[in-house]
Protein backbone atom coordinates (compact mmCIF):
# COMPACT_ATOMS: atom_id res chain seq x y z
CA UNK A 1 0.00 0.00 0.00
CA UNK A 2 1.56 3.35 -1.04
CA UNK A 3 1.72 6.40 1.23
CA UNK A 4 -1.26 8.14 -0.40
CA UNK A 5 -3.45 5.11 0.30
CA UNK A 6 -2.29 5.07 3.92
CA UNK A 7 -3.21 8.73 4.28
CA UNK A 8 -6.68 8.10 2.82
CA UNK A 9 -7.31 5.12 5.11
CA UNK A 10 -6.15 6.98 8.22
CA UNK A 11 -8.30 9.99 7.27
CA UNK A 12 -11.40 7.83 6.75
CA UNK A 13 -10.87 6.02 10.06
CA UNK A 14 -10.31 9.33 11.83
CA UNK A 15 -13.45 10.80 10.25
CA UNK A 16 -15.52 7.82 11.40
CA UNK A 17 -14.05 8.08 14.89
CA UNK A 18 -14.72 11.82 14.92
CA UNK A 19 -18.36 11.36 13.95
CA UNK A 20 -18.92 8.56 16.43
CA UNK A 21 -17.33 10.47 19.29
CA UNK A 22 -19.02 13.82 18.73
CA UNK A 23 -20.90 14.47 21.97
CA UNK A 24 -23.54 16.59 20.28
CA UNK A 25 -24.44 13.65 18.03
CA UNK A 26 -24.29 11.12 20.87
CA UNK A 27 -26.43 13.22 23.20
CA UNK A 28 -28.86 14.56 20.65
CA UNK A 29 -29.67 18.12 19.69
CA UNK A 30 -30.60 19.04 23.26
CA UNK A 31 -26.94 18.86 24.35
CA UNK A 32 -25.74 22.45 24.54
CA UNK A 33 -21.98 22.61 24.23
CA UNK A 34 -20.12 25.85 24.95
CA UNK A 35 -19.82 28.14 21.92
CA UNK A 36 -16.73 28.03 19.77
CA UNK A 37 -15.39 28.28 16.22
CA UNK A 38 -16.79 25.82 13.71
CA UNK A 39 -14.52 22.75 13.49
CA UNK A 40 -13.39 21.28 10.19
CA UNK A 41 -14.00 17.58 9.68
CA UNK A 42 -11.27 15.34 11.14
CA UNK A 43 -8.80 18.09 12.10
CA UNK A 44 -11.23 20.31 13.99
CA UNK A 45 -9.78 23.69 14.93
CA UNK A 46 -6.10 22.67 14.92
CA UNK A 47 -5.16 25.02 12.09
CA UNK A 48 -6.57 27.98 14.00
CA UNK A 49 -3.97 27.58 16.76
CA UNK A 50 -0.90 28.58 14.75
CA UNK A 51 2.54 28.63 16.39
CA UNK A 52 1.36 30.80 19.31
CA UNK A 53 -1.67 29.00 20.78
CA UNK A 54 -1.62 31.29 23.82
CA UNK A 55 -2.42 34.29 21.62
CA UNK A 56 -4.73 32.61 19.10
CA UNK A 57 -6.87 30.92 21.77
CA UNK A 58 -7.09 34.17 23.75
CA UNK A 59 -8.26 35.97 20.61
CA UNK A 60 -10.92 33.31 20.05
CA UNK A 61 -12.04 33.56 23.68
CA UNK A 62 -12.71 37.27 23.24
CA UNK A 63 -15.17 36.34 20.52
CA UNK A 64 -16.79 33.23 22.01
CA UNK A 65 -16.60 33.91 25.73
CA UNK A 66 -14.95 32.61 28.92
CA UNK A 67 -16.24 29.06 28.40
CA UNK A 68 -15.40 28.03 24.84
CA UNK A 69 -15.35 24.78 22.87
CA UNK A 70 -12.42 23.87 20.65
CA UNK A 71 -12.10 20.61 18.81
CA UNK A 72 -8.50 19.56 18.29
CA UNK A 73 -8.53 16.50 16.10
CA UNK A 74 -11.06 14.12 17.60
CA UNK A 75 -10.74 15.58 21.12
CA UNK A 76 -13.26 18.07 22.47
CA UNK A 77 -11.63 20.79 24.55
CA UNK A 78 -13.26 23.42 26.73
CA UNK A 79 -11.19 26.53 27.39
CA UNK A 80 -11.72 28.58 30.56
CA UNK A 81 -10.65 32.20 30.10
CA UNK A 82 -11.94 34.28 33.03
CA UNK A 83 -11.07 34.46 36.75
CA UNK A 84 -14.67 33.71 37.69
CA UNK A 85 -14.88 30.52 35.65
CA UNK A 86 -11.37 29.48 36.71
CA UNK A 87 -12.57 29.63 40.32
CA UNK A 88 -15.51 27.38 39.42
CA UNK A 89 -13.21 24.77 37.87
CA UNK A 90 -10.23 24.96 40.24
CA UNK A 91 -11.98 25.54 43.56
CA UNK A 92 -15.76 25.22 43.71
CA UNK A 93 -16.00 22.09 41.56
CA UNK A 94 -12.39 20.93 41.70
CA UNK A 95 -13.52 17.43 42.74
CA UNK A 96 -15.22 17.12 39.34
CA UNK A 97 -12.32 18.56 37.34
CA UNK A 98 -9.41 17.00 39.27
CA UNK A 99 -8.34 14.29 36.78
CA UNK A 100 -5.43 15.16 34.52
CA UNK A 101 -4.98 14.54 30.82
CA UNK A 102 -1.78 12.54 30.22
CA UNK A 103 0.13 13.41 27.05
CA UNK A 104 1.32 10.36 25.14
CA UNK A 105 4.99 11.26 25.62
CA UNK A 106 4.68 11.14 29.42
CA UNK A 107 3.51 7.52 29.30
CA UNK A 108 7.07 6.48 28.39
CA UNK A 109 8.53 4.17 31.05
CA UNK A 110 5.07 4.26 32.67
CA UNK A 111 6.02 7.62 34.14
CA UNK A 112 2.38 8.72 34.42
CA UNK A 113 1.66 5.87 36.84
CA UNK A 114 4.09 7.34 39.38
CA UNK A 115 4.15 11.04 38.55
CA UNK A 116 2.29 13.18 41.10
CA UNK A 117 1.04 15.65 38.44
CA UNK A 118 -0.66 12.79 36.59
CA UNK A 119 -1.71 10.39 39.34
CA UNK A 120 -5.49 10.17 39.80
CA UNK A 121 -6.76 11.71 43.02
CA UNK A 122 -6.79 8.86 45.52
CA UNK A 123 -5.00 7.55 48.60
CA UNK A 124 -1.60 7.27 46.93
CA UNK A 125 -1.84 10.74 45.43
CA UNK A 126 -2.88 12.18 48.82
CA UNK A 127 0.08 10.56 50.58
CA UNK A 128 2.49 11.90 47.97
CA UNK A 129 0.94 15.35 48.01
CA UNK A 130 1.18 15.47 51.80
CA UNK A 131 4.82 14.35 51.61
CA UNK A 132 5.63 17.19 49.20
CA UNK A 133 3.68 19.88 51.01
CA UNK A 134 4.33 19.04 54.66
CA UNK A 135 7.81 17.53 54.54
CA UNK A 136 9.96 17.87 51.41
CA UNK A 137 8.92 21.41 50.48
CA UNK A 138 8.00 22.65 53.94
CA UNK A 139 9.59 25.87 55.15
CA UNK A 140 11.63 24.15 57.92
CA UNK A 141 13.10 21.67 55.41
CA UNK A 142 13.88 24.42 52.89
CA UNK A 143 15.40 26.59 55.63
CA UNK A 144 17.74 23.71 56.41
CA UNK A 145 19.10 23.82 52.85
CA UNK A 146 19.74 27.56 52.71
CA UNK A 147 23.51 27.34 53.07
CA UNK A 148 24.10 24.93 50.20
CA UNK A 149 21.74 26.88 47.93
CA UNK A 150 23.58 30.08 48.81
CA UNK A 151 26.76 28.45 47.49
CA UNK A 152 25.06 28.11 44.10
CA UNK A 153 24.07 31.78 44.22
CA UNK A 154 27.69 32.67 44.96
CA UNK A 155 28.77 30.63 41.93
CA UNK A 156 26.41 32.68 39.75
CA UNK A 157 27.79 35.91 41.20
CA UNK A 158 31.39 34.84 40.55
CA UNK A 159 30.55 33.87 36.97
CA UNK A 160 28.95 37.27 36.33
CA UNK A 161 31.87 39.03 38.03
CA UNK A 162 34.42 37.25 35.85
CA UNK A 163 32.33 38.02 32.75
CA UNK A 164 32.26 41.71 33.72
CA UNK A 165 36.06 41.77 33.91
CA UNK A 166 36.47 40.35 30.41
CA UNK A 167 33.46 42.02 28.79
CA UNK A 168 31.97 38.62 28.01
CA UNK A 169 28.46 38.48 26.58
CA UNK A 170 26.28 36.45 28.95
CA UNK A 171 23.41 34.31 27.73
CA UNK A 172 20.98 35.17 30.54
CA UNK A 173 18.73 32.17 30.00
CA UNK A 174 21.66 29.74 29.94
CA UNK A 175 23.17 31.23 33.12
CA UNK A 176 19.76 31.08 34.80
CA UNK A 177 19.32 27.46 33.71
CA UNK A 178 22.68 26.39 35.12
CA UNK A 179 21.91 28.06 38.44
CA UNK A 180 18.30 26.90 38.72
CA UNK A 181 19.28 23.33 37.85
CA UNK A 182 21.98 23.42 40.53
CA UNK A 183 19.67 25.01 43.10
CA UNK A 184 17.23 22.20 42.41
CA UNK A 185 19.81 19.42 42.45
CA UNK A 186 21.42 20.49 45.74
CA UNK A 187 17.96 20.66 47.28
CA UNK A 188 17.08 17.20 45.97
CA UNK A 189 20.27 15.21 46.51
CA UNK A 190 22.99 17.64 47.70
CA UNK A 191 24.84 17.49 44.40
CA UNK A 192 25.79 20.08 41.79
CA UNK A 193 25.26 18.84 38.23
CA UNK A 194 26.14 21.86 36.04
CA UNK A 195 29.25 24.05 36.09
CA UNK A 196 29.84 27.41 34.44
CA UNK A 197 33.36 26.50 33.32
CA UNK A 198 32.55 23.13 31.72
CA UNK A 199 32.17 22.39 28.03
CA UNK A 200 28.80 23.16 26.53
CA UNK A 201 28.16 19.49 25.85
CA UNK A 202 27.83 17.21 28.88
CA UNK A 203 25.74 14.08 29.22
CA UNK A 204 23.51 15.54 31.91
CA UNK A 205 22.98 18.81 30.05
CA UNK A 206 22.22 17.05 26.77
CA UNK A 207 19.78 14.72 28.51
CA UNK A 208 18.01 17.51 30.38
CA UNK A 209 17.68 19.69 27.28
CA UNK A 210 16.63 16.73 25.14
CA UNK A 211 13.90 15.76 27.59
CA UNK A 212 12.45 19.28 27.79
CA UNK A 213 12.41 19.53 23.99
CA UNK A 214 10.78 16.11 23.63
CA UNK A 215 8.15 16.93 26.26
CA UNK A 216 7.25 20.18 24.49
CA UNK A 217 6.78 18.80 20.97
CA UNK A 218 3.19 18.90 19.66
CA UNK A 219 2.11 15.29 19.20
CA UNK A 220 -0.63 14.25 16.78
CA UNK A 221 -1.28 11.21 18.96
CA UNK A 222 -2.71 13.52 21.61
CA UNK A 223 -5.23 14.89 19.12
CA UNK A 224 -6.03 11.61 17.37
CA UNK A 225 -5.96 8.81 19.98
CA UNK A 226 -6.71 6.25 17.29
CA UNK A 227 -3.13 6.63 15.95
CA UNK A 228 -1.47 6.67 19.39
CA UNK A 229 -0.17 3.06 19.17
CA UNK A 230 1.81 3.93 16.03
CA UNK A 231 3.72 6.95 17.46
CA UNK A 232 4.02 8.22 13.89
CA UNK A 233 6.11 11.29 14.85
CA UNK A 234 8.37 9.35 17.19
CA UNK A 235 7.54 11.68 20.08
CA UNK A 236 7.13 8.91 22.62
CA UNK A 237 10.28 7.13 21.42
CA UNK A 238 12.27 10.34 21.76
CA UNK A 239 10.85 10.93 25.22
CA UNK A 240 11.59 7.34 26.22
CA UNK A 241 15.23 7.78 25.18
CA UNK A 242 15.90 10.94 27.21
CA UNK A 243 13.68 10.00 30.14
CA UNK A 244 15.41 6.61 30.28
CA UNK A 245 18.83 8.27 30.41
CA UNK A 246 17.72 10.63 33.18
CA UNK A 247 16.25 7.74 35.16
CA UNK A 248 19.57 5.89 34.82
CA UNK A 249 21.43 8.91 36.19
CA UNK A 250 19.07 9.18 39.13
CA UNK A 251 19.38 5.43 39.67
CA UNK A 252 23.14 5.86 40.17
CA UNK A 253 22.57 8.72 42.61
CA UNK A 254 20.03 6.73 44.63
CA UNK A 255 22.21 3.61 44.71
CA UNK A 256 25.25 5.62 45.75
CA UNK A 257 23.30 7.13 48.64
CA UNK A 258 22.10 3.67 49.72
CA UNK A 259 25.68 2.38 49.59
CA UNK A 260 26.86 5.27 51.76
CA UNK A 261 24.09 4.55 54.25
CA UNK A 262 25.23 0.93 54.53
CA UNK A 263 28.93 1.68 54.91
CA UNK A 264 28.88 5.00 56.82
CA UNK A 265 25.36 5.53 58.18
CA UNK A 266 26.33 8.44 60.44
CA UNK A 267 27.85 10.60 57.70
CA UNK A 268 25.67 9.46 54.79
CA UNK A 269 22.58 11.34 55.89
CA UNK A 270 22.31 14.71 54.10
CA UNK A 271 18.85 15.73 55.33
CA UNK A 272 17.91 16.57 51.75
CA UNK A 273 14.85 15.56 49.75
CA UNK A 274 16.38 12.24 48.70
CA UNK A 275 16.77 11.26 52.35
CA UNK A 276 13.12 12.13 52.88
CA UNK A 277 12.03 10.01 49.91
CA UNK A 278 14.10 7.05 51.13
CA UNK A 279 12.53 7.35 54.58
CA UNK A 280 9.10 7.44 52.96
CA UNK A 281 9.98 4.40 50.85
CA UNK A 282 10.97 2.31 53.90
CA UNK A 283 7.44 2.58 55.28
CA UNK A 284 5.65 -0.19 53.38
CA UNK A 285 2.29 1.45 54.01
CA UNK A 286 3.29 4.25 51.62
CA UNK A 287 3.53 1.87 48.64
CA UNK A 288 6.64 3.50 47.14
CA UNK A 289 9.54 1.65 45.52
CA UNK A 290 13.08 2.77 44.77
CA UNK A 291 12.05 2.91 41.11
CA UNK A 292 9.24 5.30 42.03
CA UNK A 293 11.75 7.62 43.72
CA UNK A 294 13.57 8.13 40.42
CA UNK A 295 10.35 9.21 38.71
CA UNK A 296 9.55 11.62 41.55
CA UNK A 297 13.03 13.14 41.17
CA UNK A 298 12.33 13.68 37.45
CA UNK A 299 9.13 15.60 38.23
CA UNK A 300 10.78 17.80 40.84
CA UNK A 301 13.86 18.38 38.72
CA UNK A 302 12.16 19.32 35.46
CA UNK A 303 9.32 21.25 37.11
CA UNK A 304 11.50 23.48 39.26
CA UNK A 305 14.45 24.03 36.93
CA UNK A 306 12.83 24.93 33.63
CA UNK A 307 10.08 27.10 35.10
CA UNK A 308 12.48 29.17 37.20
CA UNK A 309 15.08 29.74 34.49
CA UNK A 310 12.56 30.87 31.86
CA UNK A 311 10.85 33.21 34.33
CA UNK A 312 14.19 34.78 35.23
CA UNK A 313 15.09 35.39 31.59
CA UNK A 314 11.77 37.21 31.08
CA UNK A 315 12.32 39.18 34.29
CA UNK A 316 15.80 40.41 33.34
CA UNK A 317 14.58 41.28 29.84
CA UNK A 318 11.76 43.44 31.19
CA UNK A 319 14.06 45.14 33.71
CA UNK A 320 16.62 46.02 31.04
CA UNK A 321 13.84 47.42 28.86
CA UNK A 322 12.50 49.51 31.77
CA UNK A 323 15.47 51.33 33.35
CA UNK A 324 13.20 53.21 35.78
CA UNK A 325 11.84 49.95 37.20
CA UNK A 326 15.33 48.46 37.32
CA UNK A 327 16.60 51.50 39.23
CA UNK A 328 13.84 51.13 41.85
CA UNK A 329 14.60 47.44 42.30
CA UNK A 330 18.33 48.11 42.64
CA UNK A 331 17.72 50.91 45.14
CA UNK A 332 15.58 48.63 47.30
CA UNK A 333 18.28 45.94 47.24
CA UNK A 334 20.94 48.49 48.18
CA UNK A 335 18.89 49.81 51.11
CA UNK A 336 17.98 46.37 52.45
CA UNK A 337 21.15 44.39 51.77
CA UNK A 338 23.87 46.98 51.48
CA UNK A 339 26.65 47.12 48.92
CA UNK A 340 28.99 44.25 48.07
CA UNK A 341 26.73 41.64 49.64
CA UNK A 342 24.82 38.78 48.08
CA UNK A 343 21.06 38.49 48.24
CA UNK A 344 20.01 35.85 50.76
CA UNK A 345 16.74 34.02 51.29
CA UNK A 346 16.36 35.74 54.66
CA UNK A 347 16.16 39.09 52.82
CA UNK A 348 13.02 38.13 50.87
CA UNK A 349 10.39 39.46 53.33
CA UNK A 350 12.03 42.90 53.20
CA UNK A 351 11.83 43.30 49.41
CA UNK A 352 8.27 44.42 48.56
CA UNK A 353 9.21 46.08 45.27
CA UNK A 354 11.05 42.96 44.13
CA UNK A 355 7.92 41.01 45.03
CA UNK A 356 5.87 43.33 42.82
CA UNK A 357 8.35 42.86 39.95
CA UNK A 358 8.12 39.07 40.21
CA UNK A 359 4.32 39.14 40.31
CA UNK A 360 4.24 41.31 37.22
CA UNK A 361 6.60 38.93 35.41
CA UNK A 362 4.25 36.08 36.31
CA UNK A 363 1.32 38.10 34.98
CA UNK A 364 2.81 39.26 31.68
CA UNK A 365 4.94 36.20 30.95
CA UNK A 366 3.38 33.09 32.52
CA UNK A 367 5.64 30.24 31.47
CA UNK A 368 2.59 27.99 31.65
CA UNK A 369 0.04 29.92 29.54
CA UNK A 370 -2.37 27.02 29.99
CA UNK A 371 -2.49 24.97 33.17
CA UNK A 372 -1.91 21.24 32.71
CA UNK A 373 -5.20 20.16 31.11
CA UNK A 374 -7.83 18.34 33.13
CA UNK A 375 -9.88 15.45 31.79
CA UNK A 376 -13.52 14.91 32.71
CA UNK A 377 -14.31 11.42 33.98
CA UNK A 378 -18.08 11.92 33.77
CA UNK A 379 -20.63 14.13 32.04
CA UNK A 380 -21.12 17.42 33.86
CA UNK A 381 -22.56 20.90 33.49
CA UNK A 382 -20.67 24.17 33.75
CA UNK A 383 -22.19 27.63 33.46
CA UNK A 384 -25.29 26.13 31.85
CA UNK A 385 -23.34 24.17 29.24
CA UNK A 386 -23.12 20.42 28.82
CA UNK A 387 -19.55 19.10 29.11
CA UNK A 388 -19.30 15.42 28.15
CA UNK A 389 -17.08 12.76 29.67
CA UNK A 390 -13.61 12.67 28.11
CA UNK A 391 -13.48 16.42 27.45
CA UNK A 392 -10.17 18.16 28.12
CA UNK A 393 -10.38 21.32 30.21
CA UNK A 394 -7.82 24.07 29.65
CA UNK A 395 -7.50 27.01 32.03
CA UNK A 396 -6.26 29.88 29.86
CA UNK A 397 -3.88 31.69 32.22
CA UNK A 398 -2.60 33.92 29.42
CA UNK A 399 -6.09 35.34 28.86
CA UNK A 400 -6.87 35.69 32.58
CA UNK A 401 -3.65 37.64 33.13
CA UNK A 402 -4.70 40.03 30.36
CA UNK A 403 -8.30 40.55 31.44
CA UNK A 404 -8.89 44.28 30.95
CA UNK A 405 -11.62 44.26 33.60
CA UNK A 406 -8.96 43.31 36.16
CA UNK A 407 -5.73 44.69 34.71
CA UNK A 408 -5.69 48.22 33.21
CA UNK A 409 -3.18 48.43 30.34
CA UNK A 410 -2.67 44.66 30.48
CA UNK A 411 0.15 44.58 27.92
CA UNK A 412 2.24 47.11 29.89
CA UNK A 413 4.86 45.96 32.40
CA UNK A 414 3.88 47.85 35.57
CA UNK A 415 4.98 46.30 38.90
CA UNK A 416 3.39 49.21 40.77
CA UNK A 417 -0.03 47.66 40.14
CA UNK A 418 0.81 45.15 42.90
CA UNK A 419 2.02 47.61 45.55
CA UNK A 420 -1.39 48.62 46.87
CA UNK A 421 -3.19 45.28 46.93
CA UNK A 422 -2.78 41.82 48.41
CA UNK A 423 -3.03 39.86 45.17
CA UNK A 424 -0.74 36.85 45.40
CA UNK A 425 0.30 33.93 43.20
CA UNK A 426 -0.16 31.15 45.75
CA UNK A 427 -3.55 29.96 44.55
CA UNK A 428 -6.08 32.10 46.39
CA UNK A 429 -6.42 34.90 43.81
CA UNK A 430 -7.87 33.67 40.53
CA UNK A 431 -6.70 36.73 38.63
CA UNK A 432 -3.07 35.55 38.99
CA UNK A 433 -2.51 31.83 38.44
CA UNK A 434 1.08 31.05 37.40
CA UNK A 435 1.09 27.90 39.55
CA UNK A 436 -2.59 27.01 39.35
CA UNK A 437 -4.88 26.60 42.34
CA UNK A 438 -6.75 24.01 44.34
CA UNK A 439 -5.72 20.45 45.05
CA UNK A 440 -3.75 20.23 41.80
CA UNK A 441 -1.73 23.39 42.41
CA UNK A 442 2.02 23.06 41.81
CA UNK A 443 3.60 21.94 45.12
CA UNK A 444 6.97 23.48 44.27
CA UNK A 445 5.96 27.10 44.87
CA UNK A 446 7.97 27.50 48.13
CA UNK A 447 11.22 26.46 46.44
CA UNK A 448 10.55 28.46 43.26
CA UNK A 449 9.76 31.51 45.42
CA UNK A 450 13.21 31.39 47.03
CA UNK A 451 15.03 30.67 43.79
CA UNK A 452 13.49 33.58 41.90
CA UNK A 453 14.26 36.25 44.49
CA UNK A 454 17.86 35.24 45.05
CA UNK A 455 18.69 34.74 41.37
CA UNK A 456 17.05 37.91 40.05
CA UNK A 457 18.59 39.85 42.94
CA UNK A 458 22.05 38.49 42.09
CA UNK A 459 21.72 39.48 38.44
CA UNK A 460 20.84 43.10 39.21
CA UNK A 461 22.18 44.00 42.69
CA UNK A 462 25.90 44.09 41.96
CA UNK A 463 25.79 44.62 38.21
CA UNK A 464 24.62 47.08 35.63
CA UNK A 465 23.93 45.69 32.17
CA UNK A 466 24.18 46.63 28.52
CA UNK A 467 22.81 44.72 25.56
CA UNK A 468 25.19 42.78 23.33
CA UNK A 469 26.75 44.77 20.44
CA UNK A 470 24.30 45.63 17.70
CA UNK A 471 21.23 45.32 19.91
CA UNK A 472 19.24 48.29 21.18
CA UNK A 473 16.10 48.23 23.34
CA UNK A 474 14.01 48.74 20.22
CA UNK A 475 15.55 45.64 18.61
CA UNK A 476 14.99 43.25 21.51
CA UNK A 477 12.78 40.40 20.28
CA UNK A 478 9.94 39.86 22.77
CA UNK A 479 8.30 36.99 20.90
CA UNK A 480 7.67 33.82 22.84
CA UNK A 481 8.15 30.24 21.70
CA UNK A 482 5.75 27.49 22.70
CA UNK A 483 7.12 24.30 24.28
CA UNK A 484 7.00 22.52 27.62
CA UNK A 485 7.05 26.09 28.96
CA UNK A 486 6.71 29.44 27.21
CA UNK A 487 10.19 30.86 26.66
CA UNK A 488 11.83 33.69 24.77
CA UNK A 489 12.10 32.82 21.10
CA UNK A 490 15.40 34.71 20.88
CA UNK A 491 17.66 34.35 23.94
CA UNK A 492 18.57 37.49 25.87
CA UNK A 493 22.30 38.24 25.74
CA UNK A 494 23.90 41.11 27.64
CA UNK A 495 27.18 42.24 29.17
CA UNK A 496 27.45 42.69 32.95
CA UNK A 497 29.22 45.75 34.33
CA UNK A 498 30.32 45.63 37.96
CA UNK A 499 28.36 48.30 39.79
From Swiss-Prot:
Its main location: plastid. One of its GO terms (biological process) is terpenoid biosynthetic process. It comes from the Eukaryota. Keywords: Chloroplast, Heme, Iron, Membrane, Metal-binding, Monooxygenase, Oxidoreductase, Plastid, Transmembrane, Transmembrane helix. Heme binds at residue 442. It catalyses: peregrinol + reduced [NADPH--hemoprotein reductase] + O2 = labd-13Z-ene-9,15,16-triol + oxidized [NADPH--hemoprotein reductase] + H2O + H(+). Gene3D superfamilies: Cytochrome P450. SUPFAM superfamilies: Cytochrome P450. The keyword Metal-binding applies. Belongs to the cytochrome P450 family. This is Labd-13Z-ene-9,15,16-triol synthase, chloroplastic. It comes from Vitex agnus-castus.
